[in-house]
Regions:
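A conserved amphipathic terminal alpha-helix motif
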Residues: 105-140
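Short amphipathic
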Residues: 4-12
Length: 140
């Protein structure tokens, strides 16, 4: 059975405004997430994320509520229908920020079940790695 969502949560030693910039601005996204990034930061805006080892993937911005909620739809395969929804929620916690990331919609992808399961498993591991990189980037 394909899990429908992944949830990860970390506390970052930086204020929400700094974390917001890191998760929404292309020049920061390349410091922790992808090798190249383009983002039109408005609902309906296009995203283009490139990893040299994995290719280029597109997305669409869904929610921009600075500095609290950023959400985007993410299509990981150019030849496949459907997308997952990534919602990043930032909450002040003293001088730090709690960042919660939920990626959902794996069960609704139109891919074969083994591919959906593998994709969810890879992203579960990937978000752990990427969020650790984000935390390190935020305090540089």
């Amino acid at each position: 059975m394909v899990p429908d969502s992944i949830a990860r949560e970390i506390v970052i030693d930086a204020p929400p405004e700094r974390v917001w910039a890191i998760v929404t601005e292309a020049q920061h996204m390349v410091g922790w997430f992808s090798d190249e990034a383009e983002i039109d930061l408005r609902p309906g805006g296009a995203m283009l994320l490139t990893w040299h080892a994995h290719g280029t993937y597109r997305g669409r911005v869904e929610t921009v509520e600075a500095p609290h909620t950023f959400a985007f739809r993410w299509l990981r395969r150019e030849d496949a229908e459907g997308s997952t929804l990534v919602v990043m929620t930032l909450t002040p916690e003293g001088a730090s920020t709690r960042l919660r990331v939920v990626e959902s919609g794996f069960a609704d992808l139109t891919w074969p079940e083994d591919e959906r399961t593998r994709h969810a498993d890879e992203n579960r591991v990937g978000w752990g790695v990427e969020l650790a990189e984000l935390r390190a980037y935020a305090v540089r």
